[in-house]
Amino acid sequence: NPTMGEEWRRGWDPENIKPKVTDQRALVVGSGPSGLECTVQLARRGYQVVLAEAEDKLGGRVLFESSLKGLSAWKRVVDNRVHEILQKSNIEVYKESRLTAEHINEFGVNNIFLATGSNWRKDGIGRSRRAPIQGLESVKVYSPEEAIQNYKDIKGPLVIYDDEQGYLAGVVADHLNAKNIEVVFVTP
């Protein structure tokens, strides 16, 4: 987010998009918030853009998080960008298109933007802990998405270890508690 990050101090204004300087095409891999924004900005500059998404829907983890109680407004991040992308003739969108390095090389573009997201750690390493929690290999450990999607498989109390101390752990705890799953909430 150039406005929030104060990139404007270096002359990077998100409202004043400079036109393209070359006729090269661009490939954006991944359609989470960063991939969508990258695609929109490149297209606004006039580039021919190909957006490749491994899943059948655009939006990445925002689709998951916006489905949780209290976070539905977050979907506008996806909706607004997807709407603009679908209106532009200089953007091609390919869903269900998981690309390997070989695929990307075969594509023949010089400008490649990887916006493939990240994965949750399941070893206990986080903001305050720099070493894995011993013994986790002997118990079932879920990511936030896995806990929500597989809640019927959860037997007994579930410990939510919140080392980020942000919004998501509390929202996941509330969601699971509403599904009658006993939650023990731990913050370091």
Task: Give short role names for the model-derived ranges.
Residues 1-4, 33, 69:
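Proline-rich low-complexity regions
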Residues 1-19:
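Cysteine-cluster motifs in flexible loop/terminal segments that predominantly coordinate metals
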Residues 20-54, 58, 94-105, 115-129, ...:
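Rossmann-like dinucleotide/flavin-binding elements
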Residues 60-110, 126, 188:
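N-terminal Rossmann-like dinucleotide/flavin-binding domain of flavoprotein oxidoreductases
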Residues 6, 60, 64, 70, ...:
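Generic structural "secondary-structure junction" signal
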Residues 1-5, 85, 111:
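C-terminal catalytic ATP-binding subdomain
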